[in-house]
Curated annotation (Swiss-Prot):
GO terms for biological process: DNA topological change; DNA-templated DNA replication. CDD domains: TOP4c. It is found in: Cytoplasm. One of its GO terms (cellular component) is chromosome. This is DNA gyrase subunit A. It catalyses: ATP-dependent breakage, passage and rejoining of double-stranded DNA. PROSITE patterns: TOPO_IIA (PS52040). Few gyrases are as efficient as E.coli at forming negative supercoils. Not all organisms have 2 type II topoisomerases; in organisms with a single type II topoisomerase this enzyme also has to decatenate newly replicated chromosomes. Its EC number is 5.6.2.2. Keywords: ATP-binding, Cytoplasm, DNA-binding, Isomerase, Nucleotide-binding, Topoisomerase. Heterotetramer, composed of two GyrA and two GyrB chains. In the heterotetramer, GyrA contains the active site tyrosine that forms a transient covalent intermediate with DNA, while GyrB binds cofactors and catalyzes ATP hydrolysis. Disulfide bonds: none annotated. A motif (GyrA-box) lies at residues 527-533.
Length: 836
């Protein structure tokens, strides 16, 4: 049974659902999820800040309980429950969530580890200076006020917003069918960009990028590349790749490295990141990390990733980027309410929206000030008029029966307005003195000047812009802060570990105990022949000695041949980088399957494994073998067989043959040399034994060097005692493979036995290293060409008891290199051949 007042309206269910959902969607979009482009706030944030203003919680006053703030907000402006309001209040107080926090919290407001804030009954808050800038001039009719939900109070639809808060603090939210994710920016940079647009509305986005290169996140970190920034600024949408900021420190034991994370990517939970890394370590996805520690304190973030002994920090960092939140993507979508409609805006349009709003605020504020000044001037005009005939005015007032009668008499007899008459009636007697009259006249004159100025501002738009400009410049002067987020222009996608490795020439050293390291070429300064050099390897008497030195490029492939005839495949950048005096790390850490007594005998660096090119291998007893280079292009974890070694023999050299014109030279310890075309040795399989390359003079003699040469080159033969000789290749008679050969240098007490030989040109320099770690670099232009059978000249002054143990060629492309910087620039990456 229906009451008379009840009415039932039949309606199609589909239409009702469509209309209701549309109303709900618009409510979420306009009144909940999206920020306003003018003040950068959502309704819930705006209502909390307004409630705090009503409580007079300015920066200088005592904090108030958050429960009180949330209660007033819920009861007066935002009827959604305190438990919904409090998280919004908390976020506005977190300095890792907001670039410029709007709430000054006292108590536990959570942490970057994801810890929740304490209950609202325990925490307290007040407004920050940034929030005051948003609220400034709110009481001067600068924005529209609308009734609250129950029409008992009024609230602002937007704040005056003295700075572009939307771009300063950013915003995120999910509406119906759309979402926003606006990154925060640096206030100082944003003000400079705003001043550009203010001065010229046609300012290009390129000009904006000059002064505001990109977002500035509260947690710092790194933005990789500028492509995502440019896309965001031009279109309003883009993907920013964010990385944690980290550095590498040497462990206290000097044998390992630690990766130190000091800044997190935006919105990354530090505690969850540490858990993620630990899980990947347990799953063997991150194999190079032995321990993870969180050493963060009140001074800042410090997460320590302790690496295993011999692990490359570059490799581990790359895998952190690939598998963890050390690198994340921030999907920027600059969607905001512009004129009450959701719009995706580029950076220029977003700045312009704030400028339009601020101009409207300035004009409304000026109009308010003008009305106030005109009203006051009107009263002062009445005072001045009354002072000019004060006796008559006083007499009229005394003769009136009451206040209302006095007001009417003043209006009728002296032509005062009602407002002027009321003001005169409220004057105190002391204000009728001459001194007070002068003050009234002065105030009136000042008001007339202000009125003239206010009217001029309202009439000229350029003056409004000048006011905005002055306010921004004052903010810039007082509240400018350094940028926190670094932008790395050359950072790219990590698709391959080598993407983070720079391509540079390096020196690789191996000690007698098989400790290996790599060093930049520039650490060795070139000297004249006969110099004493610099310390290239720090040795203590009776301890390890330097066995070999090689040159390569960081992105080359290293084929590492052992004395047992085994070949291992390795990238140069995987080797640990050390200083000149550093000993390095055991090479066994980088090569799996090394057997007892097995040592590195030769290293070859190649950029690619081409068909038609060969490796030429030589043993200590004069056995040689030629193998196709592409046979070594498929590495195995525990190495592959390169040469079948006879008992008592061992591999001593490996050479790269690229064309048919190259010939092979073998040099022996007792000063003999043999030269023959490489086609005298047919290509063989990897497991083959090889053929005789040179016949040794006696059991004390053995092969010390194998070189691949051309006719236009010369060879430098170096002896143990620091003497050597440079001779033309053509001076060495070509012989058959397997012959004894010809004399390469005179062997005597002064020279000592032959250390090695190497092919050179005038554009080369030679690096010599001694058993005690002495190193010298010599330009081949300083070593003249001599006859084949001569004794040679002094190449290096060795300390008493010291002998040379290693030599290496470095190709350079300048005639004279005097500085470390020029020397480093002259090295031709990847073109050197390498030998012990």
């Amino acid at each position: 049974m229906l009451n008379k007042e009840e009415i039932i309206v039949p309606k199609n269910l589909e239409e009702e659902m469509k209309e209701s959902y549309l109303r709900y969607s618009m409510s979420v979009i306009i009144s909940r999820a999206l920020p306003d482009a003018r003040d950068g706030l959502k309704p819930s944030q705006r209502r909390i800040l307004y409630a705090m203003k009503q409580l007079n919680l300015t920066p200088g006053v005592k904090h108030r309980k958050c429960a009180k703030i949330c209660g007033d907000t819920s009861g007066d402006y935002h009827p959604h429950g305190e438990s919904v309001i409090y998280p919004t209040l908390v976020r506005m107080a977190q300095d890792w969530a907001m670039r410029y926090p709007l709430v000054d919290g006292q108590g536990n407001f959570g942490s970057i580890d994801g810890d929740p804030a304490a209950a609202m009954r325990y925490t307290e808050a007040r407004l920050t200076h940034s929030a005051i800038f948003l609220l400034e001039d709110l009481d001067k009719d600068t924005v529209d006020m609308v009734p609250n939900y129950d029409e008992t109070k009024y609230e602002p639809v937007v704040f005056p917003s003295k700075f572009p808060n939307l771009l300063c603090n950013g915003s995120s939210g999910i509406a119906v069918g759309m979402a926003t994710n606006i990154p925060p920016h640096n206030l100082g940079e944003l003000i400079e960009a705003t001043l550009l647009v203010l001065a010229n509305s046609q300012t290009s986005i390129e000009d904006i990028l000059e002064v505001m290169p990109g977002p500035d996140f509260p947690t710092g970190g790194i933005i990789c590349g500028t492509e995502g920034i440019r896309s965001t600024y031009y279109t309003g949408r883009g993907k920013l790749r964010l990385r944690a900021r980290m550095h590498v420190e040497e462990n206290s034991d000097k044998q390992r490295e630690n990766i130190i994370l000091t800044e997190m990517p935006y919105n990354v939970n530090k505690s969850r990141l540490i858990e993620q890394i630990a899980e990947l370590i347990n799953e063997k996805t991150l194999t190079g990390i032995s321990d993870v520690r969180d050493e963060s304190d009140k001074d800042g973030i410090r997460v320590v990733l302790e690496l295993k002994k011999g692990e490359s920090s570059e490799v581990v960092i790359n895998r952190l980027y690939k598998f963890t939140d050390v690198q994340v993507t921030f999907g920027a979508n600059m969607l905001a309410l512009d004129k009450n409609l959701p719009r995706t805006m580029n950076i220029h349009r977003m700045i312009s929206a704030w400028i339009r709003h601020r101009m409207d605020v300035i004009q409304r504020r000026t109009r308010y000030e003008l009305n106030k000044a005109e009203a006051r001037a009107h009263i002062l005009e009445g005072f001045l008029k009354a002072l000019s005939c004060m006796d008559e005015v006083v007499k009229t007032i005394r003769e009136s029966s009451n206040k209302e009668h006095a007001k009417q008499q003043l209006v009728e007899l002296f032509s005062f307005s009602e407002a002027q008459a009321l003001a005169i009636l409220e004057l105190r007697l002391y204000q009728l003195t001459g001194l007070e009259a002068d003050k009234v006249q002065k105030e009136y004159s000042e008001l007339l000047e202000k009125i003239t100025y206010y009217r001029k501002v309202l009439a000229e738009e350029e003056l409004v812009k000048d006011i905005i400009r002055e306010e921004l410049q004052e903010l810039h002067k007082v509240h400018k802060t350094p940028r926190r987020t670094r932008i790395e222009m050359d950072a790219g996608d990590v698709r391959d570990i080598e993407d983070i490795i720079s391509d540079e020439s390096v020196i690789i050293t191996i000690s007698g105990d098989d400790y290996v390291k790599r060093m930049p070429v520039k650490v060795f300064r070139e000297q004249k022949r006969g110099g004493q050099g610099v310390t290239g390897f720090d040795m203590k008497k009776g301890s390890d000695f330097l066995k070999a030195v090689y040159s390569a490029s960081t992105k080359d492939y290293l084929l590492i041949f052992t004395n047992f005839g085994q070949c291992y495949w390795l990238k140069v950048w995987r080797l640990p980088e050390g200083e000149r005096r550093a000993k390095g790390k055991p090479i066994i850490n980088f090569l799996e399957g090394i057997r007892p007594g097995e040592q590195v005998a030769a290293v070859l660096n190649v950029k690619r494994f081409e068909q038609g090119e060969y490796l030429f291998l030589a043993t200590k007893k004069g056995v040689v073998k030629k193998v196709s280079l592409d046979a070594f292009g498929s590495p195995r974890k525990k190495g592959i067989r390169a040469l079948e070694i006879d008992d008592g023999d061992e591999l001593i050299a490996a050479r790269h043959i690229a064309n048919d014109e190259e010939k092979v030279m073998l040099f022996t310890r007792l000063g003999m040399a043999v030269r023959f075309p490489h086609d005298k040795v047919r290509p063989m399989g990897r497991a083959a034994r090889g053929v005789r390359g040179v016949s040794l003079k006696n059991e004390q003699d053995f092969v010390v060097s194998c070189q691949v040469v051309t006719e236009d080159q010369s060879v430098l033969v170096v002896c143990d005692n620091g003497f050597g000789k440079r001779s033309l290749v053509c001076d060495f008679r070509e012989t058959n493979r397997g012959s004894v050969g010809v004399r390469s240098i005179v062997i005597n007490q002064r020279n000592g036995d032959v250390l090695g030989a190497i092919s050179v040109t005038d554009c080369d320099s030679i690096l010599l290293m001694s058993a005690q770690g002495q190193a010298i670099r010599i330009n081949m232009q300083d070593v003249r060409v001599m006859g084949r059978a001569t004794q040679g000249v002094r190449l290096v002054n060795l300390r008493e008891g010291d002998t040379l143990v290693a030599m290496e060629k470095l190709s350079i492309n300048t005639e004279s290199v005097e500085t470390e910087e020029n020397l480093a620039a002259s090295v031709q990456s990847g073109q050197d051949t390498i030998e012990e």
